[in-house]
Structure formats: structure tokens, C-alpha cells
């Protein structure tokens, strides 16, 4: 999701984009570091909205602190860590970056609803095993994890954290990861990002 410093006065994603277009290069976005999910989500928004905003990379959550302090304009963050900050009015939520509205924030529009469908970005997590793990072990791990994700207590806990689980087969997850990596490479090229040492 896209959150902004309350001191900036943005109420919608359109507000941020309007200012960014009127004053190219003046707005800033923080990230948890170059190439991090928060960086790539903001780059996807930057490219989709055709705005000139400056990236200020940090190590970890320090960038979010700078947004709350009003020294940086916006940040892209998963739903779970954002909700308490939104509720405490430490950040202003402008849009969620997922395809659908977040269950914990049903009144917040998606980036697509705000007019930028190409800015969709999914913050996701998964479980992986070393590359040479025998297939039988991988499938056993998958089965155990799937059983856990079907437990009502686990589903309820994930929902309270803003996590929407997706049960994929091993093969579907392999394809999902490959597709996501390919899309990230395309984004990196279109955003003119270069690898760092």
C-alpha cells in the first residue's frame, strides 16, 4: 500500500500524483533499501503514473520513520505493519497496491481504482527449500504447510495480520516465483535501475 506523511496533506493517490507532476523531482519516497519490495512497489507506481520522484533508500524500517517524521513524502508497505500506523494517524494511506481492496482496510481504494492499474504490486511471502532438496521432501513440506494453512486458528491469525493466504501447489509456486522475478526484471529495466555490488 502507498502511505504518505500526514504533514504533506495528501488525501488520495491522485493528490500525490498531481503534486509530483506539477513539481517534478521534488517529492521523495523511502524504501527499505535498493531492490527491496518497498523500493520495487514505489518504482512500479512511479513508472505507471509517469512521475518524477526521488528514491531515498534506507536499511530496513528507518525510511518509514522518516515518512512519519515528515522528512520523506511517501513509502510503499505491506498492509500488516501499516494498519497500526494508519490507526494512530502516523501515516496517511492513499491506496492499496493489490488487485483487490484489503480486508482490514475495506474503504481504501486500490491503485487500479485510483487510475493506475499498472502500479499493482503484491507483497508476498512463501516457503522455499534448498535447490537440491529431494522432490519427495518438498512435497511433504508442502503438505504439512497446506494443512497448517487450513486450520481455522491459523487462518484467523493471518487475517488479523492482513495476510491473505493463497494455497498453491509446488509447481504453481515455482511458476509464480519465476513470473514474479521476470516481472521484476522488466520493471527494473523500465525504471532504469542498475545492479549494485
Question: What role is predicted for each listed range?
Answer:
Residues 20, 44-48, 62-75, 80-88, ...:
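Short helices/loops that flank or line small-molecule/ion binding pockets
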Residues 58, 76-78, 96, 121, ...:
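Short beta-strand and adjacent tight-turn residues that come in two discontinuous sequence segments
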Residues 28, 73-77, 92-95, 184-186:
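Paired acidic/hydrophobic, glycine-rich loop segments that form the ligand-binding mouth/hinge
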Residues 48-51, 135-197:
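An extracytoplasmic/periplasmic, membrane-proximal ligand-sensing/linker region
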Residues 82-150:
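C-terminal lobe and pocket-closing loops
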Residues 26, 34, 50-73, 85, ...:
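N-terminal (or domain-start) structured segment
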Residues 12, 70-71, 78, 90, ...:
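Conserved functional loop/turn residues at catalytic and ligand-binding sites
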Residues 1-62, 74, 111, 124-157:
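Hinge/capping helix and adjacent helix->loop/strand transition within the periplasmic-binding protein
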